[in-house]
Amino acid sequence: MWPSNHSDPQPETCISNPNEKGGSLDLAQLPMELRNNLMRSWPSYSGTGNPAIFWQLEWRKHGTCSFNKFNQIKYFYEAFNNWNGMGLYDLLRFEGIVPGASQTAPKTYDKMKFIEAIKRRHFRDEVTVIPQFYCNKGTDLREIRMCIDYNGFEYMNCTGTSTSLVGTCGNQIQWYA
C-alpha cells in the first residue's frame, strides 16, 4: 500500500530518521493474526526471503508517508484488507488467467485481458478504474497496482507521471509463479 497525493504521486521515506516516532516498524506491535495474514498476502520476493525485513522496507519507504492517517497496525491491516477484498488471484484464475509454472515456462497474455477481467469480476463492469501494471524487462509481470482514495475505502484511477499512470508493461505480459 503506497500513499500518494496529486502533487507528489509517490512520496517516499517521509520519516527519514528510523529513531523518530513511526520511522521504524515495530513488529511486536503487529498482532499475530495480522502477521500471519501478511505472511500469506505480502510475502518477500526479494533475495532475503524474510518477510519481516520486506515489511520493514515497505513501511520505511511507503508507510511512513501515511503515518499521520494510519498508524503501523492500521496501515498493515488496510493493506491486507485491500488485498483480501480484491481476491485478485482467484479473480484472474476464474477468467482463465493463470501463471506459468516457472520463469522458463511463463504464460503470455494481452494486458487488456487482465484489465477486462478485473473490471468484470471486481467492479462488475460498473467502475472504470484502470489498474497499473509493472513488469521487469517490459514483459515479466511484477505487480498490479490499484489506487485507493485518501481514506482507504474507494478505488480510483492513479495520478502522477505518465509512467506511474500506465506502469512499465507493454501490451503483452508474461506471468509465471
What would you call each of these model-derived segments?
Residues 1-37:
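An N-terminal structural lobe/cap that precedes and organizes the functional/catalytic core
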Residues 36-177:
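C-terminal, well-folded lobe of enzymatic/effector domains
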